[in-house]
């Protein structure tokens, strides 16, 4: 073999980016994701219109929804989107904040890399900074009691503000607090799945209502059944009210017409016995997860029982929690003690569709919010805002800690981190300072999105916090002044902030550790590992 003969390890159809090129490319991809959602941050943030291949439209300023709906191919960009998804899953809000901070951390890291600071030193500095940031956040956090509905209402309204439900935020905030406090368990934990969100267009957002029970998007199986039952005794069945067919292919040959009548009568008797069992238990309302035979429907209507069939499993679980009923899998086992109770069970027409309302439950551990809106797009955006607000109220009840909003927490963190950086030796000090500067992207962006002078606002905020004991002063985007955010009712759960900063830092560190990107091009005529045109990141590259 000749000494100068090249050794080919990777095939020709593979793109490879190494060292500084790989880092620069990944940083750029992450920054673009941050910039994409940055204009949506805060109560004065703008909305994005997302259109798919079929022409379906989503209009939203919810960070995680924007990123989920975007067609992103770049692997580094996908990692940033995971930050938003994690934030949504863990706390329900703060997704845009997390991604914007991550984008700014990457920008600051790139500046340090350009100054020949090694990536591992940047990572070490960021780790020191995030650790200190978590300590400072705990110090400036305020305690809140789980039954302090006034504070919880303010937290809900802070989350809703600027998300398409502005006019009805007072009412929605009250409903959300009522809903979340209703489903808190003995240990103080909140299962958000027990709050059902039902959407119906055809009315204004003001007509949104909270039902202390469950709303089922079904109608009664027979018009002969009563439409409304008061003092309802509710049976929940996870078995069909039908004659069970045999699994074998056996045939029954009938030669005598009387035998046929006996056969039919026997089937009728079986169905009648099932209905009699339901009646004997004392039930006057039946929710069945499976089917109900036509003849059984007739017998149930005759007995004055309101029945609903093919109810979703998730709805059955909520009905059980709301009414106290047990889900019975064999109709023969149905007893009076398995029944649940509700003040009213009624079929009503909402936007032309029949729906079953199970209301006035004594101690409902499952509730429903019926979201109304003039169009589908309005309803979807309000539902997203409500879902986020439910998440932050739940966090507050579980943790009992809140911080000031309006960029107050970030400015205080930045100030404390700069002081902390003085005691950090080596080049890590530069990374801690860069981290502090990066956190100020939140108040800066709030000011920009409100049409204010970002530099002027930052100077005012820094000056106010430097006076001491002013950790709660942030930017009021409606007046353009630096004000006490706690007095204005602009507060957020501590967990939203800690999770956003932690997730953003971890994603940044992961991207900075990458110094080699190997991607196979899409093979013609077959499926390949296409990761987009990763070299062309000057614009949006292969990301969208």
From Swiss-Prot:
Belongs to the TCP-1 chaperonin family. It comes from Methanothermococcus thermolithotrophicus. Signal peptide: none annotated. This is Thermosome subunit. The keyword Lipoprotein does not apply. InterPro entries: Chaperone_TCP-1, Chaperonin_TCP-1_CS, Cpn60/GroEL/TCP-1, GroEL-like_apical_dom_sf, GROEL-like_equatorial_sf, TCP-1-like_intermed_sf, TCP-1_chaperonin, thermosome_alpha. Forms an oligomeric complex of eight-membered rings. The gene is ths. Keywords: ATP-binding, Chaperone, Nucleotide-binding. GO terms for molecular function: ATP binding; ATP hydrolysis activity; ATP-dependent protein folding chaperone; unfolded protein binding. It comes from the Archaea. Coiled coil: none annotated. The lineage of its organism: Archaea, Methanobacteriati, Methanobacteriota, Methanomada group, Methanococci. Pfam families: Cpn60_TCP1. Molecular chaperone; binds unfolded polypeptides in vitro, and has a weak ATPase activity.
């Amino acid at each position: 073999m000749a000494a100068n003969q090249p050794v080919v390890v990777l095939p020709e159809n593979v793109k490879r980016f190494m060292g500084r090129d790989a880092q620069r490319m990944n940083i750029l991809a992450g920054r673009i994701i941050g910039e994409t959602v940055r204009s949506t941050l805060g109560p004065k943030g703008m909305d994005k219109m997302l259109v798919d291949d079929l022409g379906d439209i989503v209009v939203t300023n919810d960070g995680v929804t924007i990123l989920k709906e975007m067609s992103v191919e770049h692997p580094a960009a996908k990692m940033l989107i995971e930050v938003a998804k994690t934030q949504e899953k863990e706390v329900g809000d703060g997704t845009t904040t997390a991604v914007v901070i991550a984008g700014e951390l990457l920008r600051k890291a790139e500046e340090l890399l350009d100054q020949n600071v090694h990536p591992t030193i940047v990572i070490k500095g960021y780790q020191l900074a995030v650790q200190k940031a978590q300590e400072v956040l705990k110090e400036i956090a305020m305690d809140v009691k789980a039954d302090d509905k006034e504070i919880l209402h303010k937290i809900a309204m802070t989350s809703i503000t600027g998300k398409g439900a502005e006019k009805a935020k007072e009412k929605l905030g009250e409903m959300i607090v009522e809903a979340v406090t209703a489903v808190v368990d003995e240990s103080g934990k909140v299962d958000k799945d027990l709050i059902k969100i039902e959407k119906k267009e055809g009315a204004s957002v003001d007509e949104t209502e909270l039902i202390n029970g469950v709303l089922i998007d079904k109608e009664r199986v027979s018009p002969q059944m009563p439409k409304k039952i008061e003092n309802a005794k509710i049976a929940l069945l996870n078995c069909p009210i039908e004659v069970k067919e045999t699994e074998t292919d056996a045939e029954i040959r009938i030669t005598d017409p009387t035998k046929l009548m006996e056969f039919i009568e026997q089937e009728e008797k079986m169905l009648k016995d099932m209905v009699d069992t339901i009646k004997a238990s004392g039930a006057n309302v039946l929710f069945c997860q499976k089917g109900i035979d036509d003849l059984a429907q007739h017998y149930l209507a005759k007995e004055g029982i309101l029945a609903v069939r093919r109810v979703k499993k998730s709805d059955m679980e909520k009905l059980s929690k709301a009414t106290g009923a047990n889900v019975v899998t064999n109709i023969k086992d149905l007893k009076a003690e398995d029944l649940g109770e509700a003040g009213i069970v009624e079929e009503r027409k909402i936007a032309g569709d029949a729906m079953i309302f199970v209301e006035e439950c004594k101690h409902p551990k499952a509730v429903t919010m019926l979201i109304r809106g003039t169009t589908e797009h309005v309803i979807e955006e309000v539902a997203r805002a409500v879902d986020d607000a439910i998440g932050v109220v739940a966090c507050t009840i579980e943790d009992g800690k809140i911080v000031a909003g309006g960029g107050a927490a970030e400015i205080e963190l930045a100030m404390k981190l700069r002081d902390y950086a003085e005691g950090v030796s080596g080049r890590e000090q530069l990374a801690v300072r860069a981290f502090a500067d990066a956190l100020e992207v939140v108040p800066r962006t709030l000011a920009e999105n409100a049409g204010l002078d970002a530099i002027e606002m930052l100077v005012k905020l820094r000056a106010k916090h430097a006076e001491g004991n002013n950790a709660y002063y942030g930017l009021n985007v409606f007046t353009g002044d630096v004000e006490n955010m706690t007095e204005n009712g602009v507060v957020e759960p501590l967990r939203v902030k800690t999770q956003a900063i932690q997730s953003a830092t971890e994603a940044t560190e992961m991207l900075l550790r990458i110094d080699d990107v190997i991607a196979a091009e899409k093979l013609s005529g077959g499926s390949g590992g296409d990761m987009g045109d990763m070299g062309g990141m000057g614009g949006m590259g292969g990301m969208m």
